[in-house]
């Protein structure tokens, strides 16, 4: 079916000749162009191909047909169509939808767009009654409706995928809430933390991403249908009835705004860009951690590849692709922003370019989320290597300074003494834990035997008792918070 296209690529569906013979030839198609009012001249084949968008917007066939069914019902309710005509139209549309979903009917790549295809197919099936469907609407509000309906469904799909990644992160974080590793700043070993807390940081980033998707969905939840081309309609329509029938909570209150803005696309794409930024940062760490230089984790073979020439390689290609595809999503967002920035109200044909950008953006984000959840779930941590790394780099130096401060030494003085001791250790190829007490006392008389407990990595982690910190109680609170979020949204 045209609606299933996870890759985001424009899919060339087989040419449909029409069971009842419509659009048999290009000439007949031109003669039956539904917008051919003023002009009788034929457009060139090149212009027709250039103007066509069905290869992109064809995926919205279900939304287009659903919207048309609701429109026919509204026209009948308001007395603009007879109930008999509306029933015939709705029945014809239901048949088209069923045939598209089953594969009995395929999109015609010679059609200009999905709206023209559906209307022409409807007319071919039920005759002139089908020509009444477009009363009191324009393709301008029709495409805005289709896009909102389609993207509302995509938001729900994205949210489900975000939850799956959060769940994988939570499971790994729970298993490694006490696994000590070095925390980094500037990619330099900084302070001891737990692997669980590191993973929970990404879980909480994605929680906010989930919320941004929800926010985008709330602002998208207004129906543009009935705005017509730009100024509304002279017919006594009921836009609220039609909106409610389609599951919207409100209508676009200004007809110009309803047909001419795509900020709902931009907002969703911005949320996708942030999701991808977070996935990219996580991917970068997975790439680093799985390297021989770190050896903190091992990615499952199902999410890595080998080399065509180097037999020892296990390449983190899936993580690298998530990182690489982030730039693609950014490009989609910038492309649509650039398209919209200079457009006067109301509709302009430039806006046909919105769908390729937003579809690719959403498709790519979904694909990366789909790969990330199982890749994280199957990841194997190497706690022993994390601990070895934490034992190097003097990441307990801050705790040494804190020890002195708690003994009454001003922090800046304590900071200086701690730095001098680190320099001494480097010069003598040793570590803080192995320096004799006599050496410590040459720097300050306040040092006692208790300092060795204070600068042990386990103590360093346990003493981080502040809310949000890496201490056991704090990490457990973070785990509980993420678990509550998952329970509330799954």
Language-model segments: residues:
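Generic, well-ordered alpha-helical scaffold segments in large soluble proteins
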Residues: 71, 92, 96-99, 121, ...
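Alpha-helical support elements that line or immediately flank enzyme active sites
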Residues: 151-162, 272-277, 281, 405
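A helix-coil-helix interface module used to build multimeric assemblies
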Residues: 31-232, 237-243, 305-306, 321, ...
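Charged, flexible cofactor/metal-binding loops and thiol motifs
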Residues: 174, 182, 188-342, 349, ...
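Short, conserved catalytic/metal-binding motifs centered on acidic residues
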Residues: 18, 141, 282
């Amino acid at each position: 079916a045209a609606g299933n296209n996870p890759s985001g690529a424009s899919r060339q569906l087989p040419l449909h000749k029409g069971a009842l013979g419509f659009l048999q030839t290009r000439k007949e198609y031109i003669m039956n162009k539904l917008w051919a009012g003023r002009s009788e001249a034929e457009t060139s084949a090149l212009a027709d191909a250039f103007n066509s968008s069905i290869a992109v917007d064809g995926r919205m066939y279900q939304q287009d047909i659903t919207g048309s069914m609701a429109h026919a019902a509204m026209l009948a309710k308001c007395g603009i169509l007879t109930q008999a005509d509306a029933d015939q139209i709705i029945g014809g549309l239901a048949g088209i939808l069923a045939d598209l979903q089953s594969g009995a009917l395929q999109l015609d790549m010679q059609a200009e767009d999905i709206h023209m295809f559906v209307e022409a197919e409807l007319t071919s099936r039920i005759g002139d009654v089908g020509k009444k469907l477009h009363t009191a609407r324009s393709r301008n509000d029709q495409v805005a409706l289709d896009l909102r309906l389609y993207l509302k469904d995509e938001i729900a799909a994205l949210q489900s995928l975000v939850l799956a990644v959060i769940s994988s992160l939570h499971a790994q974080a729970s298993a490694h809430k006490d696994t000590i590793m070095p925390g980094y700043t500037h990619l330099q070993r900084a302070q001891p933390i737990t692997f669980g807390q590191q993973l929970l940081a990404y879980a909480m980033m994605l929680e906010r991403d989930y919320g941004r998707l929800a926010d985008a969905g709330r602002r998208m939840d207004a129906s543009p249908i009935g705005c017509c081309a730009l100024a509304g309609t002279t017919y006594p329509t009921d836009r609220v009835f039609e909106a409610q029938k389609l599951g919207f909570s409100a209508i676009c209150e200004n007809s110009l705004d309803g047909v001419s803005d795509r900020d709902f696309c931009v907002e969703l794409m911005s949320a996708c860009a942030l999701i991808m930024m977070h996935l990219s940062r996580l991917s970068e760490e997975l790439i680093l951690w799985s390297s021989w230089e770190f050896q903190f984790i091992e990615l499952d073979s199902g999410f890595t590849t080998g080399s065509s020439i180097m037999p020892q390689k296990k390449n983190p290609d899936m993580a690298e692709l998530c990182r690489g595809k982030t730039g693609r999503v950014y490009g989609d967002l910038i492309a649509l922003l650039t398209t919209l920035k200079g457009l006067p109200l109301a509709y302009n044909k430039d806006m046909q370019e919105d769908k390729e950008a937003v579809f690719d953006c959403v498709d790519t984000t979904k694909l990366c989320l789909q790969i990330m959840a199982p890749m994280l779930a199957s990841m194997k941590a190497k706690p022993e290597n994390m601990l070895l790394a934490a034992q190097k780099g003097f990441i307990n130096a801050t705790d040494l300074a804190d020890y002195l401060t708690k003994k009454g030494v001003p922090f800046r003085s304590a900071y200086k003494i701690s730095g001098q001791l680190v320099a001494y250790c480097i010069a003598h190829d040793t570590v803080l834990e192995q320096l004799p007490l006599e050496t410590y006392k040459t720097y300050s008389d306040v040092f006692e035997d208790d300092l060795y407990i204070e600068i042990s990595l386990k103590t360093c982690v346990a003493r981080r008792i502040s809310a949000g910190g890496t201490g056991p109680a704090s990490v457990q609170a973070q785990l509980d918070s993420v678990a509550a979020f998952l329970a509330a949204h799954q």
